[in-house]
Design a protein with these regions (language model features):
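Glycine-rich beta-strand-to-loop/alpha-helix junction loops that act as flexible
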Residues: 33-35
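Catalytic core of pol beta-like nucleotidyltransferases
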Residues: 1-29, 38-43, 54-106
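Short, conserved active-site loops that position catalytic residues or coordinate cofactors/metal ions
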Residues: 45-47
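Short hydrophobic/aromatic beta-strand micro-patches
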Residues: 50-52
Length: 106
């Protein structure tokens, strides 16, 4: 279950990252998931962000680009690019976890 309120610093980080992503990719959804969405984060937690788009031709190349975008924002960001068609496959356990526990930010 998603946490009711998220730390304002995390929201600001996610929003800055969202704006950077939108400069390069046509985004369907951006979802914060993992420990920050569940409220179970600790000082070593990364900031898991699912990025759903049809623009990801080469998922590994996109991952490298998305990781590069984190450098000037926050090193804890862990981007997870997902093709829209894969995100619509709710039988995928990873996608199911994002849908059930994630918080949509775009």
């Amino acid at each position: 279950m998603a946490k009711e309120t998220i730390n304002k610093d995390i929201i600001n980080i996610v929003n800055k990252y969202k704006e950077e992503i939108k400069k390069k990719y046509n985004i369907t959804e951006i979802i914060l998931f993992g420990s920050y969405a569940k409220g179970t984060e600790n000082e070593d937690s990364d900031i898991d962000i699912a990025i759903v788009s049809d623009d990801f031709d080469d998922i590994y190349e996109c991952m490298a680009v998305l990781m590069g975008m984190t450098w000037n924002i926050d090193a804890r960001i862990e981007p997870h690019p997902i093709l829209k068609e894969d995100y619509e496959n709710v039988s995928n356990p990873f996608v199911k976890e994002i849908i059930e526990t994630g918080i949509k930010v775009a």
